[in-house]
Amino acid sequence: MSYCRQEGKDRIIFVTKEDHETPSSAELVADDPNDPYEEHGLILPNGDINWNCPCLGGMASGPCGEQFKSAFSCFHYSTEDIKGSDCIDQFRAMQECMQKYPDLYPQDEEEEEEAKPVEPVEETADTKASAAKEQGASS
């Protein structure tokens, strides 16, 4: 015997094996694309940018939020052949702002490693032998 039980906000439905064997008669309700409580991705159904998308990692807020929005909007709406090539000034302004707040906008480790001077590598006996062999072969 199947039955339904409400627990707080949840509704628990117990069904029998026979209930599962018959096709469902439930009708699906189409999602409302304009539902303000529905979570959306980066681009809203109307094509606008969803500044509240968690995928932006909070970049749209904070001390450089306006510069980020300006650069990102320019890129999103760019119609140039090389998309965003008309947005260099906006991206430069965003970068300059972010450099003022290194604690909030840390640079990638890869960039930091590239900026470090390269330390000389100690030569091992193997590399000296290889160099001597090459020098002897070229003589």
From Swiss-Prot:
InterPro entries per record: CHCH (IPR010625), CHCHD4 (IPR039289)
Cross-referenced Gene3D superfamilies: 1.10.287.2900
Gene Ontology CC terms: mitochondrial intermembrane space; mitochondrion
Major localization listed first in the record, in broad terms: mitochondrion
Keyword Oxidoreductase part of the UniProt annotation: yes
Keyword Ubl conjugation listed: no
Span list, region Disordered: 104-139
Domain of life: Eukaryota
Disulfide-bonded cysteines: 53-55, 64-97, 74-87
Processing and modification events after translation: Forms intrachain disulfide bridges, but exists in different redox states.
Keywords: Disulfide bond, Mitochondrion, Oxidoreductase, Protein transport, Redox-active center, Translocation, Transport
Motif Cx9C motif 1 in this chain: 64-74
Motif (Cx9C motif 2): 87-97
Pfam families reported in the protein's UniProt record: CHCH (PF06747)
Any one Gene Ontology molecular-function term assigned to this protein's record: protein-disulfide reductase activity
Composition-biased stretches (Acidic residues): 106-124
Subcellular location field: Mitochondrion intermembrane space
Role played: Central component of a redox-sensitive mitochondrial intermembrane space import machinery which is required for the biogenesis of respiratory chain complexes. Functions as a chaperone and catalyzes the formation of disulfide bonds in substrate proteins, such as COX17, COX19, MICU1 and COA7. Required for the import and folding of small cysteine-containing proteins (small Tim) in the mitochondrial intermembrane space (IMS). Required for the import of COA7 in the IMS. Precursor proteins to be imported into the IMS are translocated in their reduced form into the mitochondria.
Entry's free-text remark on domains: The CHCH domain contains a conserved twin Cys-X(9)-Cys motif which is required for import and stability of MIA40 in mitochondria.
Subunit text: Monomer. Can form homooligomers. Interacts with GFER and forms transient disulfide bonds with GFER. Interacts with MICU1. Interacts with COX19 forming transient intermolecular disulfide bridges. Interacts with COA7 through transient intermolecular disulfide bonds. Interacts with AIFM1; the interaction increases in presence of NADH. Interacts with NDUFB10.
Protein name per the record: Mitochondrial intermembrane space import and assembly protein 40
UniProt gene name: Chchd4
